[in-house]
Amino acid sequence: MTWIPLHCHSQYSILDATCSIKKFVAKAVEYQIPALALTDHGNLFGAVEFYKTCKQNAIKPIIGCELYVAPSSRFDKKKERKSRVANHLILLCKDEEGYRNLCLLSSLAYTEGFYYVPRIDRDLLSQHSKGLICLSACLSGSVAQAALESEEDLEKDLLWYQDLFQEDFFSEVQLHKSSEEKVALFEETWLKQNYYQFIEKQLKVNEAVLATSKRLGIPSVATNDIHYLNPDDWLAHEILLNVQSREPIRTAKQNTYIPNPKRKTYPSREFYFKSPQEIAELFAAHPETITNTCIVAERCHLELDFETKHYPIYVPEALQKKGSYTEEERYKASSAFLEELCEQGLTSKYTPELLGHIAKKFPGEDPLTLVKERLKLESSIIISKGMCDYLLIVWDIINWAKDHGIPVGPGRGSGAGSVMLFLLGITEIEPIRFDLFFERFINPERISYPDIDIDICMIGRERVINYAIERHGKDNVAQIITFGTMKAKMAIKDVGRTLDTPLAKVNFIAKHIPDLNATITSALEADPELRQLYVDDAEAAEVIDMAKKLEGSIRNTGVHAAGVIICGDPLTNHIPICVPKDSSMISTQYSMKPVESVGMLKVDFLGLKTLTGIHIATQAIYKKTGILLRAATIPLDDQNTFSLLHQGKTMGIFQMESRGMQDLAKNLRPDAFEEIIAIGALYRPGPMDMIPSFINRKHGKENIEYDHPLMEPILKETFGIMVYQEQVMQIAGSLAKYSLGEGDVLRRAMGKKDHEQMVKEREKFCSRAAANGIDPSIATTIFDKMEKFASYGFNKSHAAAYGLITYTTAYLKANYPKEWLAALLTCDYDDIEKVGKLIQEAHSMNILVLPPDINESGQDFEATQKGIRFSLGAVKGVGMSIVDSIVEEREKNGPYKSLQDFVQRADFKKVTKKQLENLVDAGTFDCFEPNKDLALAILNDLYDTFSREKKEAATGVLTFFSLDSMARDPVKITVSPENVIQRSPKELLKREKELLGVYLTAHPMDAVEHMLPFLSVVPARDFEGLPHGTIIRTVFLIDKVTTKISSAEQKKFALLQVSDEVDSYELPIWADMYAEYRDLLEEDRLIYAILAIDRRSDSLRLSCRWMRDLSTVNDSVIAECDEVYDRLKSQKVYSSTKKSTGAQSSAMIKKVETREISPVTISLDLNKLRHSHLFILKGLIRKYSGSQALSLVFTKDNQRFASISPDADFFVTDDISSLLQEIEATNIPARVLATTV
């Protein structure tokens, strides 16, 4: 007997079902089931994937949803006592009308009815029931709940649904009954009781529902509430439930596990994908309930439309004024408007200078004719294929952004190959001049809608998206949902935590998963140590097996970083929408690929901070010089720019800041924009291997050879090396007479490694090349090289567009360094490390970075004649609203004349005394009083005087005469310097760093700068590039000292936070070194040291081997240093193999401590510690909370591993004996260490 599963959950019922769509459908194929429904909880997330997978496997897909129905109104969001938040209801799509209604219902459940879960109500259901089949759902449905109450309630509920859905309403019966043998395996009495109570309810409901339904003429269907695939998947499912609840399903006690009664669990272990035979046995007394599932399936004949585009349309303004028009008239008008914009672009974009560049590229050709012919080709394809609206919509958004001063990038992706996009201003790089092809953007041989991605200034991105919403309607625009999945490492950690497996073991397994893209299976195959653990350790094997079952499960939802969907009418006419967690904007329920496949237009709005920097710099330059620079018009042959690159001074240059890029720029010495394009394409995994040849060929150190003379014009600009995908297209055209469209088809086939297609293309290429007079063996060799190259070839259009950004930033740095570095500092002011490097870069270019000044500084860092003036907004503790107030008053009433003048004019509603003190210490008032301590004393008196008088004036206490007196006899505040306590220069400098994030006016190392060349020191910025085991000399400033006690040996050690003039880093001083050098470990002390580079773990670590106070360094100290240095270099400092260090990460473990050891310290053994122990311990600490600080120290193999230092949650009662007794009684692997500081 055929049975159709109609109540099924996939992993899109997030953290409530384990079935992937692929395996779910495969199981239906195994059972030879002809149709299958998907009814995830409250959403349609997986509908398109499910539909396509079913179609691929010749199974009829039935798209449905188990909706949540509010007991009253969906707008009622108060939980009544003994009242359910929502009841369950199954809806299945019969046809397209039903699909639209289900999309709308699911959407409104999120946007209107969300309360714990997305909910509809009966009122909404009554309005949108057409085309839907309704099933009464499980025990959580209102029908089942009514059956448990009374026959009268049941009949009333059934009649309501029957009246609404007529013959398309089916009552639903389920029976998740196990054999007594299976029930006997339940470990807990309460679990058995839950099971029997559950089955008793199901039997009672089934009996009542079947009888009443029969009497009312309502057909019934038998379903199984599927949440996992196989009978033995129940445990993986239970683990998944408790990944969500964060309860361990069991807890360790002595040498065994005790089930956790607080865990989430299903009452039966029968929620798997049963076979038709199993269902037939369960419902043998009611075979019609099985037959009726086939009737439901027969009524469902939804066909999703993957051909129609639901793109928005563009109506030219002239046509809007007309009022009424046909679609033919509208498209004709849109086409004409597009052509009109292009004609305007021909005049404004193709200047004589640009046409001259094209003429130079194509001697003997009329450049404007070439442009017009190219435009004619592009227009014919774009207009005939109905793409005008798409281009005009993108043009409209970009044009609005530019009109409103929001910087937009010069192009991204293959769109930079289109002349039409260049004329419209969508891109800013001329394609003919740089051999960029339209066919790479839209291939005439295989026409499909292209992607046009938009780079936008980070600050203006939200405004642009809001414009798109306003322009096209809030119901027509949404962001795109994303689904976060359990990768291998996360699955191991989630499962290990839920099984309460020892943390050290869990993290040991996780550490052996090599990277984010690795699977557990591949890790087992590649790692003998992990494989051996799997064989030898049953506990580890259980974690791995369960994690394999859950690997890839969806864990959470998010929002796509850039993608926005724009539809021509309300989205819910075509797709469901939702509101993802932690998001305020509407999002699609379908992820990126499915949502595009059903005809939605995706536009990527990518925030690019570099554009913000360019905008700030060019505005500053315009203000200073009257010259408005634009990326599209700056000269591409500027010698200052190339000279800067030759020096490798690429800090602050887009995509060229890395050490590798600096070296590439110095070695290549680019002298043409085309070489900058090539740099962007070459510096990636794969083609990076060709960089040495590329450099050598440019400088004549390596011969440039071509496999055939026809390849020389194509590969000449890249010195005979294939770098771009477009070169494959050109070679195919030149040697084998491919059209550019055919060449793009070849490129795609090579990139996808489509073996079947490649066999055809090889034969086609070689035969056509032979017809063109090319030797077959040469043709085969060339094809082989093209095929190998295609796996890493780069899109030249994208490289050119981004190359223009690179060149623009280099041009700004070379010609307007102060303005450019000031702009970068403004963009990155909250990234202290970046600010430090930019300031160092400014110093290297002989540009001073000056402290903030009350009359020169504003919100941004600003270029002045003297240097770069620090931003007021970047001073810690001074908000932008205060800065706005200061600047507004300055612009309105002129510069501040003195500290008193400033305080007198300050708005005390916005400015506090503490903020003014911060401004003083930051140097903001040095122009009036360079002695900061004296300025603070004056400020204190001024603030008190004027704030009091302004308050009195505001309340009317001061009379007209007293105010007049104040005006005639202004307040005079004088403070004698002798009465002011003066801070030391070191203290002032430290305070400066606290407020500005960097040492600005001076650095403690300035005094010893002359010594450094003689000390052979390596700066911190070079550490990252050094190999494991390298011994180095360095100099640093101690910023912070944290003293600790090792748990194993009870010996003191220290963690230092240290820095040089640019970088900061952490440096441990272990017990043996600490005993020797403890007297040197003082904050603000300069140290000369020998360090060893340790790369045995995943990250760079440093180990200190010798140190001295830098102020004591003399010839004998240098000799001692040299002796230690030589000895360490001759030794094998570290083993070359990486050792397993056990636990690598945990939410409750910090590898870096920032507080001193506490009076009470408890040591926990990671080898025996379980997640449940931490829960118990946390509860006990709360139970015995008090004023005594507590630290937890984690050990592994008797070695200190990590610790948790005191915070608000780790203070216990002074009398800790009771706490310690309870800890001992719980079998937590803990011991109390000495309680002295």
UniProtKB/Swiss-Prot annotation:
Chief location: cytoplasm
GO molecular function: 3'-5' exonuclease activity; DNA-directed DNA polymerase activity
Record's keyword terms, sorted: Cytoplasm, DNA replication, DNA-directed DNA polymerase, Nucleotidyltransferase, Transferase
Localisation per UniProt entry: Cytoplasm
InterPro entries according to UniProt: DNA_pol3_alpha_NTPase_dom, DNA_pol3_alpha_thumb_dom, DNA_pol3_finger, DnaE2/DnaE/PolC, DNAPol_HHH, PHP_dom, Pol/His_phosphatase_N, Pol/histidinol_Pase-like
Chain segments annotated as transmembrane: none
GO-annotated cellular components: cytoplasm
Domain of life: Bacteria
Protein name per Swiss-Prot or TrEMBL: DNA polymerase III subunit alpha
Organism for this UniProt entry: Chlamydia trachomatis serovar D (strain ATCC VR-885 / DSM 19411 / UW-3/Cx)
